[in-house]
Amino acid sequence: MNSTLQNQTKTNLEKVGTDPLDTFPRRHIGPNLQQTAEMLKELGLSSVEELIDKAVPVGIRLKKSLDLPKASTEHKILQNLKGIASQNQVFRSYIGAGYHSCIIPGVIQRNILENPGWYTAYTPYQAEISQGRLEALLNFQTMIIDLTGLEISNASLLDEGTAAAEAMFLAYSVRKNETAKKFFVSELCHPQTIDVVVTRANPLGIEVQIGNHESIELNEDFFGVLLQYPATDGKIIDYTSFIQRSHNVGAISTVAADLLALTLLKSPGEMGADIAVGSSQRFGLPLGFGGPHAGYFATKDEFKRSMPGRLIGVSKDSQGNSGLRLSLQTREQHIRRDKATSNICTAQVLLAVISSMYAVYHGPEGLKNIATRIYKFTSIFANVLKNAGFSITNEFFFDTITIQAGTKVQEILNRAYSKKINFREYKDGKIGITLDETVNLEDLKDLLEIFEIKNTDIEKLFVDVSNVPDSFKRKTSYLTHPVFQSHHTETKMLRYIRKLESRDLSLTTSMIPLGSCTMKLNATTEMYPVTWPEFGAIHPFAPADQTKGYKIIFEQLEKWLCEITGFAGVSLQPNAGSQGEYAGLLAIRRYHESRNESYRNVCLIPISAHGTNPASAAMAGFQVVVVSCDPNGNVDLEDLKAKAEEHKKDLAALMITYPSTHGVFEESVKEICQIVHSCGGQVYMDGANMNAQVGLTSPGEIGADVCHLNLHKTFCIPHGGGGPGVGPIGVAKHLVPFLPGHVLVDNATGNEHGAVSAAPWGSASIVLISWVYIALMGSEGLTNATRNSILNANYIAKRLEKVYPVLYKGKNGFVAHECILDLRPFKKSAGIEVEDVAKRLIDYGFHAPTMSFPVPGTLMIEPTESESLEELDRFCEAMLLIYQEILDVQSGTLDKTDNPLKNSPHTAAMVTSDRWDHLYPRERAAYPASWLKDHKFWPYVGRVDNVYGDRNLVCSCLPIESYQ
């Protein structure tokens, strides 16, 4: 062994001590110490701390480190979490109420739910690099349209309760009688759905009337009705005549329907419903103690422009081929702001994809067989119970029976508990039992034994079960498109999933530098526990003694988030950032009401705010008043003072984002909070940019009263291609009593009502990801992540500022965790739009940064802390090469209309075609940078025509020829 190698070996041996080697922060943070030094040199700085001192105002800096547990290792944290998970008890839950155990096909679980190629993608704003999940979502929409018997469906909502509340708001928005303020809700709807609807109705002045649909006297004061199908107690009811009655008085009818039941039962469309809502949870999604699950929303074509959520449509690309895209985006909050159809931004794309694939894998016959088997088991169970003298209160049912057990209730429940089985308990002494896809002969025998019935020949009875009564039977076909007929072997299914995955750019391909989106690492260790049955197989309404592990997770995570935000209380219930905004504003509203100041209804919002802010304010019943920004992008203090003073008597709140949406730490943020407080208002902080705060400052330190967090941004829950997300809110002490509660479960807020989500803790199973992330990083790791996110953003800004002006900087010339590049001059000098640069980046293998927000004609870049120096440099090189292409257009070297920017992105089919008529070579089109020879991402379609797609709206699967 030579002396150099001996010395190196000796040095390595000396370095290795007793400390664990699988520490996580060095795996999560991209730049190492040497790369950090290089980046600081580029910035002309000597240390990261010097950068932070220059970028973050001294007056808002925390005085001490975060009080969090010491960082754990990856191996140790999974051991600890297994111990916590073991404190949950996984019972067979036949509770129902909209949540059901199901069998998740392994090919779908492993290759979608557990696959970063699917779960690390972003919302499909860049259609050309999102064709895979767009096709899966189009399948989802087709599935919903077919099963509900309606004409158009969106690409998912947050859950069934939210979908029902959105249906109420659509009905309210399109009502012909402006004086109609009443909304009828059947008492047979799921309790949690009623709770969410009532929460939504109150700020809007809508009167919710809950009652019996058979006896309610409808009149012109009602603008809508909501029905459950089958009913929460299991009854199957044909609502045709009632829906006609509602139409006679001008009311819009909504049916909350079970998708699996619709494979056997008459559809809402056949009954005349205007809207159908529900959950796709039983189509392959784990219970997860409440979520995440994909809600659905279908309606008639005439209401398409009022429909909430994302809508996938078919258009054509630059080559005349079919291309999918997000359609009718002018409905969304980014454009219509407080007049938007909804505030929903993040939906449940990953879960909608899984549910659609469940339908693709089983096909119509497979789904019908699953439903028929459940129905037969339920029928046998009901018949045997009747013969044994028990009273079944619902004559017609699909999967749920309600039993009048009289004095035997408690002993039945005790026997069920001894077999680790959960039933639904009603306050009037009835027992509800809902069967599902997982039920087998042994389960049914156990159920009968609980009722002291033994030695029943179930298999013989199975043969004799009659079909669904003809009056309720579905007569129409569904899922007739070839995609639902073609992939029923695992081999074919695997290849179909892989084909679609290959069409999408995710974090497995390259960095996704979207400003205000924080597309950081979603580490494998963080993702592991999501599919553990100890967490995934628990019903959201399971008794508290079965969910002690979850209780530990919630309490610890809430405590950690309180420490990070500087607040006194946290609610994990909101299922998205937009829902967190809504919940936070409702807390402010309830606070004012508790002080007899319900007249405070004005919400000040800076003109630069994200579109969800005004949309959420409108949902919470506030009047939006816009505050100007100064030339530096900061809130105009004089305008704020004037408007706060003008509305001193009715000021409810101010909504601000920090750091600002312009990518800087505003120096006057504490003064801004003081101005609002002095006028009696509360300060709501949008937590979209929390990745620049953790460990350095906090909403509480700054002076905010409430802030939502995006766990799918700052705290590592993946974006899932457009959801799931989690948007918990932190609040100051005086707002803690006004956090969202739940009608069925004590979720530790002390409130019985005011739920914003159907489940008590929202998407409970994925908050585990954030728990693991914080536990792995510890105080120092989290703070260093924040520092590095700011360093990476400033490095990119510095490298690109000579050719792309950085629009806004702080007073010392630095940005926060993101920067805005000004591309507007190129439109005049070369005819190049910001969209051309965004699409050209695809040819370089990158997802474009955020386009034209908050300033039209700009790109907002957020690299996060997870990207290495090599990746940052590769992105910068791509941007610099694109700048050279713009110069070539300016000089005439490239044609003004026929150039690589205008024709981007270039597909493999385009550059390998026999015909090439462009005024630049194929190689420049496809391989504009040297590194692309090693690894090239090919977009599946050319530039998609947005205008054509909206003018020729098609939102369900195309004929099979279009896929050939």
UniProtKB/Swiss-Prot annotation:
Signal peptide: none
Residues found modified as N6-(pyridoxal phosphate)lysine: K713
Enzyme superclass (EC): oxidoreductase
Ranges where the record places region Disordered: 1-21
Cofactor dependency: pyridoxal 5'-phosphate
GO molecular function: glycine binding; glycine dehydrogenase (decarboxylating) activity; pyridoxal phosphate binding
Any single Pfam family the record assigns to this protein: GDC-P
Biased composition (Polar residues): 1-11
GO biological process, one term: glycine decarboxylation via glycine cleavage system
Transmembrane segments: none
EC number: 1.4.4.2
Record's keyword terms, sorted: Oxidoreductase, Pyridoxal phosphate
Domain of life: Bacteria
Oxidoreductase found in the keyword field: yes
Gene Ontology terms: cellular component: cytosol; glycine cleavage complex
Record-linked InterPro entries: GcvP, GDC-P_C, GDC-P_N, GDC_P, PyrdxlP-dep_Trfase, PyrdxlP-dep_Trfase_major, PyrdxlP-dep_Trfase_small
Function: The glycine cleavage system catalyzes the degradation of glycine. The P protein binds the alpha-amino group of glycine through its pyridoxal phosphate cofactor; CO(2) is released and the remaining methylamine moiety is then transferred to the lipoamide cofactor of the H protein.
Subunit structure: The glycine cleavage system is composed of four proteins: P, T, L and H.
Record's protein name: Glycine dehydrogenase (decarboxylating)
